[in-house]
């Protein structure tokens, strides 16, 4: 397969993606989404003027940009796109699928209040509290199918602490989890970092009947056979029955560390009738063990405990996914002066990431095409560490250099070789 054929097949797949994921969207809005998906990937950008430039239309660039800007204001566009992606992605979620929930943000360090709509102070990870940086909050949710290293984006919701009706970040996160649970039939194992060590989250999970793995801070009281005790004290007394070496990525580095782990039966004081397990993990050099509270009550054998430990470590790969989405499509460079447009753009970027990660990256029928896209990326750069960087870079090169977007129903530039054309249409 040559690059021209690959680019043609990619455009055809993008058309199919729009048609299948958004079957009930009006035709004009569907055409707009196709243009945005193509332009964002061809330019790896969320800046409207650059997206318009990648469309290469036979009209003034300004007119293309103005049209895209108008369509971004369509009523409930963000909800339409978010719900469509989630409805399709729910098919990847089963009983043992890890559903990772990770709050993040869009930092606008050079923006000033009044320059962009509803800018608010966001979390500063280096300081451990809300700092002086302005921006918007995100909640990113992904699914990792069992026995797979691939990641499926499910939802990426943006909000501002200054928007009308805002109550708390916790309520926003619970709204995201609730919509995922409804779409997935309450399947999956929900994984949350230490920020989820709060009654607000445990009450919700238990009330909704959802399985979870949540990392504890250690200062929470739990019920054990010998009464109420701090989680950290219970962890110190836990027998480490099993040992193994695990490999995971953290902060861009692949680490292999020896760990020891064990578990204890516990209950929450507010929910004494719900049986839980406290899984304790220790590794060399750590000051205190990692404590994971889970509903997976069978977490006693090596195999079942390993599922809990690896399930939580899978959540750390979401950090790579968030970096991929932010860097590959420059989402933090977004420049829009209406809040509704900002939310719609974030939803559209989610759909673009879903096209690259789930539509191309996970489907066996498109394995040959995805492999060629990765090879295009390798020719231009060193092999990217993260699989989806290779996909995004390859799609960018093929879209930008071979043909242009001619609409969902418009004629496409076909490969010159008839044999290649036949392959492209299979």
Give the residues covered by each predicted segment:
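Generic, well-ordered alpha-helical segments
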Residues: 43, 60, 133-135, 343
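Short, positively charged, Gly/Tyr-enriched micro-motifs
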Residues: 17-79, 145
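Noncatalytic, typically N-terminal accessory segments of nucleic acid-processing enzymes
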Residues: 8, 50, 60, 113-116
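Single, function-defining residue in the core of a domain
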Residues: 1-42, 84, 108-112, 144-426
């Amino acid at each position: 397969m040559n690059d021209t054929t690959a680019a043609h097949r990619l455009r055809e797949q993008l058309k199919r993606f729009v048609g299948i994921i958004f079957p009930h969207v009006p035709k004009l809005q569907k055409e707009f989404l196709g243009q945005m998906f193509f332009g964002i990937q061809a330019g790896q950008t969320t800046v409207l003027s650059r997206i318009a430039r990648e469309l290469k239309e036979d009209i003034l660039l300004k007119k293309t940009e103005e049209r895209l800007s108008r369509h971004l204001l369509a009523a409930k566009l963000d909800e339409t796109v978010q719900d469509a992606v989630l409805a399709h992605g729910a098919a990847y979620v089963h009983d043992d699928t890890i559903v990772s929930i990770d709050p993040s943000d869009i930092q606008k360090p050079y923006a000033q209040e009044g320059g962009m709509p509803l800018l608010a102070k966001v979390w500063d990870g280096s300081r451990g509290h809300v700092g002086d940086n302005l921006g918007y909050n995100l909640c990113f949710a992904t699914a990792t199918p069992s026995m797979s290293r691939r990641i499926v984006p499910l939802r990426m919701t943006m909000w501002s602490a200054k928007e009308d009706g805002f109550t708390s970040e916790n309520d926003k996160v619970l709204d995201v989890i609730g919509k995922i649970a409804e779409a997935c039939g309450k399947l999956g194992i929900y994984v949350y970092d230490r920020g989820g060590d709060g009654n607000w989250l445990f009450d919700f999970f238990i009330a909704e009947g959802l399985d979870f793995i949540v990392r504890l801070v250690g200062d929470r009281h739990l019920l054990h056979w010998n009464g109420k005790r701090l989680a950290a004290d219970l962890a110190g007394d836990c027998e480490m029955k099993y040992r193994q070496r695990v490999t995971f990525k953290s902060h861009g580095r692949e680490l292999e560390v020896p760990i020891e782990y064990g578990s204890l039966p516990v209950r929450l004081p507010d929910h004494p009738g719900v049986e839980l397990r406290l899984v304790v993990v220790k590794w060399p050099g750590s000051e205190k063990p990692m404590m994971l509270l889970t509903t997976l009550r069978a977490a006693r054998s090596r195999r079942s405990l390993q599922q809990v430990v690896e399930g939580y470590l899978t959540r750390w790969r979401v950090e790579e996914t968030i970096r991929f989405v932010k860097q590959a499509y420059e989402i933090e460079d977004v420049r829009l002066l209406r809040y509704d447009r900002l939310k719609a753009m974030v939803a559209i970027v989610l759909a673009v990431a879903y096209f690259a990660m789930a539509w191309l990256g996970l489907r066996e029928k498109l394995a040959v095409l995805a492999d060629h896209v990765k090879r295009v990326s390798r020719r231009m750069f060193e092999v990217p560490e993260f699989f989806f960087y290779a996909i995004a870079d390859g799609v960018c090169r093929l879209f930008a250099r071979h043909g242009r977007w001619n609409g969902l129903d418009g004629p496409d530039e076909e490969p010159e070789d008839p044999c290649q054309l036949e392959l492209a249409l299979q």
